Amino acid sequence: MNESRWTEWRILNMSSSIVNVSEHHSCPLGFGHYSVEDVCIFETVVIVLLTFLIISGNLTVIFVFHCAPLLHHYTTSYFIQTMAYADLLVGVTCLVPTLSLLHYSTGVHESLTCQVFGYIISVLKSVSMACLACISVDRYLAITKPLSYNQLVTPCRLRICIIMIWIYSCLIFLPSFFGWGKPGYHGDIFEWCATSWLTSAYFTCFIVCLLYAPAALVVCFTYFHIFKICRQHTKEINDRRARFPSHEVEASREAGHSPDRRYAMVLFRITSVFYMLWLPYIIYFLLESSRVLDNPTLSFLTTWLAISNSFCNCVIYSLSNSVFRLGLRRLSETMCTSCVCAKDQEAQDPKPRRRANSCSI
């Protein structure tokens, strides 16, 4: 009964908004329609900027991994590369709503385009989030079980885990094609997605319980315990320094305290960014599916805030790795050296003089 009333209210609300804007669609952020160019300028700028950052950032990560063989010796690199490929595809997929904002007349089969786009980007974000959780588990095992880590985490098991992540992500959103509900608000740029494809409280709880909540809890649990271990190591080093203020302990403090402190700060940034970008989206997803809140502006902002995590991943997880930074620096030096050598070669090569009143091809 409440479901039917909510549907009727939304249809009436949308019909009244359509009457108000007459021939034009309303923009997602509610700033109205720009009738001069037939484009929602602000929304287009936001999506184009995010798309550029996501594609350029993850292309850099993938290129450095392929050009730096040392990175392949780290087990975390398997998940970082998988996450980079998934986030790169997120950026490429974001070109679809950009084109939709630039040209509202999408033609036939808008419902199919909306469903396919929503499904694909939901799967890619699921892979990215699952990789974040797997990276945290990998770091947790490396710190808590250092002696048996190489036996627990093998390349074969890592490949199987990555395959299972893709299969699980594809299956968990598949019921959206069978009328269970909308997997998210990524496709609400399309008119059909925003007005005709409604969310379902049961399907939302299904996704949150099987994907978002486990990933968030795993990240919180593992990094919290890693942070505790780092603090414990720092405390032990400080106690040893207080009891035995020798040169050996001073050297161990300089070699051990600073890395632990830096690692703890990296973990704090990782966890903070993860929750700041994903928690608003999850909360709004639950509230809107429960018919408590319906705000297109919040829907747009929380959705693209969560999608921006695809750019933050490549910045935090890659640039916090010292080996990756070394590979990036060497790659940059190689490219700069090749450019300088090419310019020097051009400067050294003698150029033939042109005769007056002559033509050269």
Curated annotation (Swiss-Prot):
Name the record gives this protein: G-protein coupled receptor 52
GO biological process: locomotory behavior; response to xenobiotic stimulus
InterPro entries assigned to the protein according to its UniProt record, in alphabetical order: GPCR_Rhodpsn, GPCR_Rhodpsn_7TM, TAAR
Stretches of the chain found on the membrane's Cytoplasmic side: 66-81, 137-159, 227-265, 318-361
Keyword entries, A-Z: Cell membrane, Disulfide bond, G-protein coupled receptor, Glycoprotein, Membrane, Receptor, Transducer, Transmembrane, Transmembrane helix
Disulfide bonds: 114-193
Residues on Extracellular side: 1-44, 103-115, 181-205, 287-296
Disruption phenotype: Gpr52 knockout mice are normal in body and brain weight. In the open field test, mice stay and move around the central zone significantly longer. The total distance traveled and brain morphology are normal. Mice are much more sensitive to the startle response following dizocilpine administration. Thus mice displayed psychosis-related behaviors. Mice exhibit a significantly higher istradefylline-induced locomotor activity.
Biological function: G- protein coupled receptor activated by antipsychotics reserpine leading to an increase in intracellular cAMP and its internalization. May play a role in locomotor activity through modulation of dopamine, NMDA and ADORA2A-induced locomotor activity. These behavioral changes are accompanied by modulation of the dopamine receptor signaling pathway in striatum. Modulates HTT level via cAMP-dependent but PKA independent mechanisms throught activation of RAB39B that translocates HTT to the endoplasmic reticulum, thus avoiding proteasome degradation.
Presence of the UniProt keyword Membrane in the record: yes
Residues bearing carbohydrate: 2, 13, 20
Homology family: Belongs to the G-protein coupled receptor 1 family.
Molecular function as annotated in GO: G protein-coupled receptor activity
Record lineage: Eukaryota, Metazoa, Chordata, Craniata, Vertebrata
Domain of life of the source: Eukaryota
Topological type in the membrane: Multi-pass membrane protein
Pfam families cross-referenced by the UniProt entry: 7tm_1 (PF00001)
Tissue specificity field: Expressed in brain, especially in striatum. Expressed in the striatum, nucleus accumbens, and lateral globus pallidus.
Subcellular location: Cell membrane
Residue intervals passing through the bilayer: 45-65, 82-102, 116-136, 160-180, 206-226, 266-286, 297-317
More details: GPR52 is located within an intron of RABGAP1L gene, which exhibits epistatic effects on GPR52-mediated modulation of HTT levels by blocking this modulation.
Cellular component GO terms, alphabetical: plasma membrane
Keyword Glycoprotein annotated: yes
Natural source organism: Mus musculus
